[in-house]
Design a protein with these regions (language model features):
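Short linear Ser/Thr-Pro motifs
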Residues: 7-9, 28, 95
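A short beta-strand-loop structural module common to alpha/beta enzyme folds
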Residues: 24-33
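Short loop/helix-cap segments at secondary-structure boundaries that form the rim of catalytic
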Residues: 14-18, 35-36, 57-58
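Anionic-ligand binding patches
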Residues: 3-4, 38-184
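N-terminal beta1-alpha1 ligand-phosphate binding loop
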Residues: 1-21
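Residue-level detector of short coil/turn "hinge" positions at structural boundaries
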Residues: 22-23, 142
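Short, solvent-exposed secondary-structure junction/capping segments
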Residues: 23-24, 69
């Protein structure tokens, strides 16, 4: 039995290594646009489940961990920005506001699965327009839900966090470790 991380995210690899160094990476080929849900939190959970199950189908004897993160602000859902204009739009929407980061977690082995969602509330200070424009010209915002990396430059905008810090990076370490204990 092997442990598989169903994600190519470098941040998730780093965080999974806090739980265990013994895992392999196999990414899923799930078309995220075909999955819908009734809330942002349920969407994150549904996407994580789809990713974990897709990899588990091909690796039924292994434990597979799938994740997905979405950002929610005033009812709008933000995934990864498509381009610079999209990143600017997202960051302007988050500037000076409270938002939520939902990360779905799904652990599978064969037909057995356990899934949950972790939610963290983030309070952003207002982002100066020149800072925002300079930020979107860096590579940092483009592979992250909500167009920011809390562990990077965006830490300067973060006035407060309620909940799991690692959840904002895409892998709630404590919750994931708890779920994994049920499978190992």
């Amino acid at each position: 039995m092997a442990l598989i991380l169903a994600s190519g995210s470098p941040r998730r690899r780093e965080l999974m290594s806090l739980i265990t160094p013994d895992y392999t990476v196999i990414t899923s080929d799930v078309d995220e646009t075909k999955i819908a849900a009734d809330s942002p939190a349920h969407l994150a959970k549904a996407l994580a489940t789809a990713k974990a199950r897709a990899v588990a189908e091909k690796n039924p004897d292994d434990v597979v961990c799938g994740f997905d993160t979405v950002v929610e602000c005033e009812g709008e859902v933000f995934g990864k920005p498509k381009d610079e204009a999209d990143a600017v739009r997202m960051l302007r929407a988050l500037s000076g506001r409270e938002h939520r980061v939902h990360t779905g977690v799904c652990i599978c082995r064969g037909r057995r699965a356990a899934a949950t969602v972790e939610t963290t509330v983030i309070h952003f200070s207002p982002i100066a327009e020149d800072d925002l424009c300079a930020y979107v010209r860096t590579p940092e915002p483009y592979d992250k839900a909500g167009a920011y990396a809390i562990q990077g430059h965006a830490a300067l905008w973060c006035a407060g966090i309620e909940g799991c810090y690692y959840n904002i990076m895409g892998l709630p370490v404590h919750r994931t470790a708890q779920l994994l204990r049920e499978f190992t």
